[in-house]
């Protein structure tokens, strides 16, 4: 696999705000026409009001990461935010059998098509369940004909948690050939956004996406966490407007 600069240290909890952490993982191989490219991975951990932990898009299992998470509290929820982010939930469910595994739109069908066995316990919706409504808000970002995503807001810190709706790859972490490809896709830092192939899946349905964007902007996020690339740890609302200008 082509080498790509990762966000070391890997498999370590990195505080973002009180009760909110990131953990960066190894690269994965993402299929594109004609081959594969490496993607850095990242998960988010939130401490809920009851002291339990909420794990968004769990990365590859790692003993050191498990130990660090266990020191924070009991894992109660394992979240697949979209149908591309689910591959490690089965391993995490094995480690935390009492945790509830939450399915995103289309993920059950996607996992079955990839012959990956994942047992989900509940489905994500357009509003937060009582399990975490005090700590997190959420919405179902609609409009794509291919990939819909559940978006979350950490209420206390004003942190928006996205997965693939924005990708923001730093040029210094990419080999030259991949840098050009990512620039053409429109996902190169500092002007990261959804890649062009994903934006095209909203053709004829942008009205749905604009309504979802309006809800996110109404949250007035202060920072934006991304699964792939550099996060926006300040000016979150402005970065959100910039990254979604293609919906205009």
Regions found by a protein language model. Name each.
Residues 56-57, 76-82, 102-104, 161-163, ...:
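Active-site neighborhood of phospho(di)ester-bond hydrolases with catalytic His/Asp-centered motifs
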Residues 85, 167, 231:
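Short active-site segment of divalent metal-dependent hydrolases/proteases
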Residues 63:
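N-terminal active-site wall of soluble small-molecule enzyme domains
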Residues 17-18, 29-30, 59-60, 77, ...:
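Cap/insert and terminal regions of metallo-dependent hydrolase folds
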Residues 74, 148, 157, 221-222:
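Short coil/turn segments at beta-strand junctions that form active-site/ligand-binding loops
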Residues 49-52, 70-76, 222:
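Short, surface-exposed connector motifs at secondary-structure boundaries
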Residues 66-131:
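Active-site HxH/HxHxD metal-binding segment of metal-dependent hydrolases
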Residues 1-58, 116-184, 211-212:
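Catalytic core of the metallo-beta-lactamase
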């Amino acid at each position: 696999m082509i080498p790509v600069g990762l966000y070391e240290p890997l498999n370590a909890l990195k505080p973002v705000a009180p009760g909110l952490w990131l953990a960066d993982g190894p690269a994965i191989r993402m299929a594109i026409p004609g081959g594969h490219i490496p993607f850095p991975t990242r998960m988010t951990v939130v401490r809920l009001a009851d002291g339990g932990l909420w794990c968004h898009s769990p990365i590859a299992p790692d003993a050191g990461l498990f130990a660090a998470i266990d020191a924070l509290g009991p894992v109660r929820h394992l979240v697949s935010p979209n149908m591309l982010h689910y591959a490690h939930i089965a391993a995490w469910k094995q480690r935390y059998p009492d945790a509830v595994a939450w399915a995103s739109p289309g993920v059950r069908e996607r996992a079955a098509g990839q012959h990956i066995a994942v047992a989900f316990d509940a489905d994500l919706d357009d509003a937060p369940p009582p399990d975490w409504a005090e700590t997190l808000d959420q919405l179902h970002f609609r409009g794509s004909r291919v990939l819909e995503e559940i978006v979350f807001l950490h209420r206390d810190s004003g942190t928006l948690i996205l997965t693939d709706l924005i990708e923001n790859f730093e040029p210094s972490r990419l080999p030259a050939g991949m840098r050009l490809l990512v620039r053409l896709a429109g996902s190169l830092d500092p002007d990261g956004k959804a890649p062009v192939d994903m934006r095209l899946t909203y053709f004829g349905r942008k009205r749905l996406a604009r309504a979802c964007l309006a809800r996110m902007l109404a949250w007035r996020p202060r920072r934006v966490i991304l699964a792939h690339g550099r996060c926006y740890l300040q000016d979150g609302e402005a970065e959100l407007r910039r990254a979604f200008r293609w919906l205009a």
